[in-house]
Each structure stands twice: as structure tokens, then as C-alpha cells.
Amino acid sequence: MDFGAMMFSTDYSIRPDDLAKMLEDRGFESMWVPEHTHIPASRTSPWPGGPDLPKDYWHTYDPFVALTAAAGATKDIKLGTGICLMIERDPIVTAKEIASLDMLSGGRFIFGIGGGWNAEEMEDHGTNFKRRWRVLRENILAMKEIWTKDEPEFHGEYVNFDKMWAYPKPVQRPHPPILMGGDGPTTFDRVVEYCDGWMPIGGRGSGGVSLAEKIVLLKRQAEEAGRDPDSLNITSFGLRPDPDLIGRMREAGVDRVIFTLPSEERAAVTPLIDECAKLIS
């Protein structure tokens, strides 16, 4: 099982390049950053994590800028978005950013995506909350065309372009792995159709179904759709450094666990990184 760490990389926390180097030196397999372009001051959408939204959400760096800085300071650690809000992004521009990052990092990018929760933030980008999953699907399918074709074209309801030339292509073939966040009733449909793995938060099940049972259901659905179930990566996101919890994740069939780090300066975050690192071996 692989181990990674996630932080809201902000203008007041440890720099992303310094964090990546610390993680790589301690044997972590991957580093992850989330995304929010902004938080509307008039937000009414409830944050799933509780009543008070942490300021990290509106101080975080652009994920691709942060990960590019991390790539330049490291050699081997993988670099992921957890998650990238493709519902708020231009697919042509983002396909270019990801291909560039994958090229410059030597093929180390992992593309974590999701539907998000902040309706007001999405609407500022022109995306209707109720249509976000359809927008996400077309964005991802269009980006795959750009990454894998010499003259890609795409004609959908939300994304539409004629044949184009768009380089570089990603180092990873056919493209960087795409992991779907979330745990809704149709999440597995999305994973099986256009993703390479599943990234649930917290390692918990839902609806009375355990994580281990969920993984069995996902792999069964993948096999029924003609996909190799063992090709799907299961990444459990946002965990604490608890040996018993990590053991349960391993038994459930999780391939990677991601620890959550607070958005703090180096001195404050180093002890927690060291605590997490003890579980890697």
C-alpha cells in the first residue's frame, strides 16, 4: 500500500516545494493539493465538513502552480490534485496544463477530480450546480481526446471544438490516471465510464455499507462493464495517522492512503509529517 499526504497549500503555510521535498525524503509516495479559486462572501452552500469553513479554502494556491513548484524540487514523488474542480475549468486550457506538468515532472501527475459542493463558487464560473456532473463528464472526455489524438475534436452539449493541434501530450499513456472523488449513488457509474480509480474521503462506508463492501461492488460493476477490476486504484483520502485505521484500509483492499496535514508553517507541520512517516514502513 502506498502513502501520500494532502495539504491546502496556502500563502501562510509551508511552501509546496519545501513540503514535497520533506515528504519525498521521508518515503511518501505522493503529495496532493486541493482546489478552490475563491469562496463567495455571500455563500449559502453548507460545507460538508462542519459549520465553519476554514480560511484555507480561500487562501489556497492554484493547484497546478503549486504542483509545478513541487515538481521542480523533487525527483520521484507523485503529484496529485485532491480534488481538481473541473466543473469550473476550461478543458482545453487544463488539458494543456496537465500535459505540461506531466511532461516537466517526468510523468508524475495524478488527476483527482470531483463535483464539488459550493454552488455559488461554481455559478461564478458559469456552471449550474444541478448540471455539474454532466459538465464534468464532457470536460474529462474532451480532455482525453486532446491527450490521446493528434487532431482531437469534440462535439458535446457543454464542450465543442473542431479538429485542433494541441501539444505536449502527457508522458503517461494514454494519460495521467484519473481518480474520482465522492461517494454518491452514481459515483461508481462515473468511475467505470471515464476514470481509473476511486478516491473516497475518510475511508468510511456509507448507507450502512462498509468501505470493503463498496470496493467489492465497484470492482464487480467494472467487470460487468468489461473493464479489468484490478486496474482500478482505490485511494482513501483524508486519513489520520492511526495504525488500526491503516490496517483496516489495507484489509479492505485500499491501494493508497492519503494523510491530511494542516496548513501550517514548517515547524508546526514537521512533527505530524514524522508521525505519519512512521506508518509507511
Give the label of every model feature segment.
Residues M1-S281:
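Active-site-adjacent structural elements that line small-molecule/cofactor binding pockets in enzymes
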